[in-house]
Amino acid sequence: FVGSRGLGDVYKRQEENLKSWIEYRSNIWRFTGAEEPLRRMSKSNQNLYSFRFDWDEEASTILGDYPLFLGAAHGLEIPFISGDYSLVPAYARPLVFPNESKEGREYLSNLMMQYWANIAKYGDPNTFVQDHRWNKFRIQNQNYLRLDSPEYIQMVYDPVDADEMLKTLESDSTLELKERCLIGWIAEMNFVEEMRGDPPFDFCSEYTSVDLLKLRRLTEGRD
């Protein structure tokens, strides 16, 4: 039997674990899917723009903490760009787009539609946009526009530092050893610009690439 305090501790541990997992995987994805390609393209193209979709105003109910479990999920930006929230199935819409988020998400959606239309028509997202200027990507600061609830829309300057991320990961107590090794292994395979010859960490030597591949498939629900 676990007392209420014990249950709370267990939930907190699970929440911290999930948040850490999401943060590391998101940073790996941002590094490989945005920052690295932009750095390469910027050598011959100065008309580049980078964004991060961060909207996570889903409902938090007894059915689940959807801002945590779903958050700014891959593909969720499409209803905002198109202005068509019916792209999300009707049964899920009250959880993904609760009424209390309507004002903020419609503001964000209108802004995103302006940006995308302006890029297509003028090559500049800021044409006729009054607020929230979207600055060009510059390799010196590797800036991106955070697309979120109105009060959080801003230019951000915090590129992923591969070495620093792996250093933090090594001692992250919110993750089990095998989880840290798995994330480090995924990062090593994806950080092409930062390719290293050695395994991510010495203390991961007990896990082979085959072990980590099996763990990844299990984690991603492919086994």
Specify the residue positions occupied by each region the protein language model found.
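Surface-exposed cleft-lining segments at the edges of enzyme active sites
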Residues: 18-25
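Mobile gating loops/cap/lid regions near enzyme active sites that modulate substrate access
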Residues: 32-223
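Helical cap/lid subdomain of alpha/beta-hydrolase-fold lipid enzymes
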Residues: 25-33
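Single conserved hydrophobic/aromatic residue that forms the stacking wall/gate
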Residues: 1-11
